[in-house]
UniProtKB/Swiss-Prot annotation:
Name of this protein: Histidinol-phosphate aminotransferase
Reaction catalysed by this enzyme: L-histidinol phosphate + 2-oxoglutarate = 3-(imidazol-4-yl)-2-oxopropyl phosphate + L-glutamate
Record NCBIfam families: hisC (TIGR01141)
Native source organism of the sequence: Microcystis aeruginosa (strain NIES-843 / IAM M-2473)
Enzyme class, first EC level, given as a word: transferase
Residue stretches of biased makeup (Polar residues): 18-31
């Protein structure tokens, strides 16, 4: 038998969204941005391709400085990572010893549990109510690190701001607020950084900046926190192509703001249309919705859509087994989805 660590052997592998290997699918299952980045960001790509034999900037200096100017944070309060998942792992490895406790909600991004178990941490899950929302702040003095996504998948709603404030104020360890979907909402928690010295905010460029294929993320925190996380960060953890295109994308922030508005408009139309078809659909502040179909099961809807080359996300989690998660696509993609659903439901 392989000499595998017990905590690794006993942990189920994380299950990512399906990536079709054939053309023709409408892909609404992994919360990617349906719109490409502007062509202008590729202007310096050739220059970087000619330098691929050389190591990239080990600290992503220009990228961090560009992010600092955009978000109004000092560059030394920012760490860049290989996607925001890298930031989650760095925080865990920096601040939590094996056998210490990590807390998160009972229904949230499933990678939190996976990486905590692989690390050998104790798991503490906090329950959400029947609307998948917090009913109060998380009070957990034994937790060295609390992962909280806001907006929180798979529902897509922000956590109650007052509850988050109280959680941060009362935490004896660190609180990492995962803002992967925040650009599709009207709120964020960057102001927490000036009021709580135990807060880390993670961001990704996969969703809102259309760079899921490059893997670029950030951690924002106090200088003291970033200094420690930087010791744990892998050397050269962000390649030069990713650094170049991500820096350029941030400089085209105005373009992406228009994209986010498009996504919000399409999201609203999809919610309204599905409710008219009898679906139970939660309001969302992300680039996806959670919906429960009438008449047939969520798994049957998933299968029938897949037969029509439309991918949505189905989870076997008992609390949401009657729901599918649908990423917001282009208007044309959503039209195709709605037509297929009407055909499946026999409402054409």
């Amino acid at each position: 038998m392989l000499p595998t660590r017990d905590c690794v052997r006993q942990t189920p592998a994380y299950t990512p969204g399906e990536q079709p290997q054939t053309a023709g699918f409408t892909k609404l299952n992994t919360n990617e941005n349906p719109y490409p980045p502007p062509a202008e960001i590729f202007a310096h790509l050739q220059e970087q391709l000619e330098k691929v034999r050389l190591y990239p900037d080990p600290i992503s200096k220009e990228l961090r400085q560009t992010a600092a100017e955009l978000y109004g944070i000092a560059a030394d309060q920012i760490i860049a990572g290989n996607g925001s998942d890298d930031i989650l792992n760095i925080a865990l490895r920096t601040f939590v010893n094996p056998c210490e406790s990590v807390a998160f909600l009972d229904l949230t991004y499933s990678l939190y549990e996976t990486i905590a178990r692989v690390h050998g941490a104790n798991i503490i899950e906090f329950p959400t109510n029947d609307k998948f929302a917090l009913e109060g702040p998380i009070i957990c003095p034994e937790a060295k690190l609390i992962f909280l996504a806001s907006p929180n998948p798979p529902l897509g709603k922000h956590l109650d701001r007052d509850y988050l404030e109280a959680t941060c104020a009362n935490a004896s360890g660190l609180v990492l607020i995962d803002e992967a979907y925040v650009d599709f909402s009207d709120d964020n928690h960057l102001d927490f950084l000036s009021r709580y010295d135990n807060v880390i905010i993670s961001r990704t460029m996969s969703k809102s900046y259309s760079l899921a294929g490059l893997r670029v993320g950030f951690g924002f925190a106090s200088r003291a926190i970033i200094e420690q996380m930087d010791k744990v960060r892998d050397s050269y953890n962000l390649d030069r192509i990713a650094q170049t295109l991500a820096t350029a994308a941030l400089k085209h922030h105005n373009y992406f703001e228009q994209v986010w508005q498009k996504v919000r408009q399409t999201r609203g139309r999809l919610i309204t249309s599905l409710r008219e078809l009898g679906f139970i659909v939660f309001d969302s502040e992300a680039n996806f919705i959670l919906a429960s179909p009438p008449q047939i099961s969520a798994s049957e809807l998933y299968n029938q859509l897949k037969e029509r080359q439309i991918l949505v996300r189905y989870f076997k989690h008992p609390r949401i087994q009657n729901y599918v998660r649908i990423s917001i696509g282009t208007d044309g993609e959503i039209d195709r989805l709605l037509s297929a659903i009407q055909e499946i439901m026999g409402t054409n």
